[in-house]
Regions:
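Alpha-helical cap/lid subdomain in secreted, periplasmic
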Residues: 61-198
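Residue-level detector of flexible, active-site-proximal loop/helix-junction positions
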Residues: 15, 50, 126, 167, ...
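Non-catalytic, glycine-rich low-complexity segments
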Residues: 201-220
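Conserved SGNH/GDSL esterase-like catalytic core that processes O-acyl groups on lipids
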Residues: 5-9, 15-104, 140
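Low-complexity, Pro/Thr/Ser/Gly/Ala-rich linker/spacer regions in secreted
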Residues: 1-4, 194-204
Length: 220
């Protein structure tokens, strides 16, 4: 019989969905990731534009159909990239104390759906200073969130993936200051591919390992 394909759930907001990308179905980061991983994997896009991580945000991910579909999919690998929409005056100032708890309960819900699943938590893609909201406090909130996301990965025993690094000095790949174009989505796909497989393909990105992982490579 045919071996079971490894199911990869890409959970997120408009960046995962592929908002603004030409030929989104083939060029969004989950679709490009599918191309890289090949037939042994089934990658599914559960991105929802405008979704907040915060359950009291203005568009909570956990209240979207994409979330219910992701739970039913019960991915073996779950990649979560949320938080950009929480850097909003409607969300962060009022509800930031819920961020860690809401994130941990989201992770837990995927582990309930598939107790064997592995979870990757993503540092957020950049918001360019050209973004209209950037000066309102969003910039400071963004960095507060990045630090919390690192903490969340540690507490949850999930692996951290840095989606900021590859796009940080490439504002040209963020035409509207927030959403990556197809080339930018390709960088995200390569970064996630590296995190899932340990193969960074010559892409010099810092590999960030969770406390639970032991690096064998440097052992004598």
């Amino acid at each position: 019989g045919q071996a079971q394909r490894i199911k990869v759930a890409c959970v997120g907001n408009s960046v995962t969905y592929g908002y603004g990308i030409e030929n989104r179905e083939t060029n969004c980061y989950p679709a490009q990731l599918q191309q890289m991983l090949g037939d042994a994997y089934e990658v599914a896009n559960f991105g929802h534009s405008g979704a907040t991580l915060l359950n009291k945000g203005y568009r909570p991910y956990t209240q979207q159909e994409a979330y219910q579909k992701a739970l039913r999919f019960a991915g073996d690998y779950v990649i979560i990239h949320l938080g950009l929409n929480d850097t909003d005056p409607r969300a962060w100032p009022n509800y930031r104390d819920d961020f860690v708890r809401d994130y941990l309960s989201l992770i837990e819900s995927f582990r309930k759906a598939n107790p064997r699943c592995k979870v990757w938590v993503c540092r957020m893609t950049p918001i360019s200073h050209r973004h209209p909201r950037f000066k309102s406090g969003t910039r400071d909130w963004y960095w507060m969130e990045q630090a919390l996301i690192e903490e969340i990965a540690r507490i949850a025993g999930a692996t951290l993936v840095d989606l900021q690094e590859g796009l940080y000095d490439r504002p040209d790949l963020l035409p509207d200051a927030l959403h990556p174009n197809a080339e930018g989505a390709g960088i995200l796909a390569r970064t996630v591919y590296g995190a899932l497989t340990g193969d960074y393909g010559g892409l010099q990105l810092p590999a960030i390992y969770s406390d639970r992982m032991v690096l064998q490579r440097d052992q004598p």
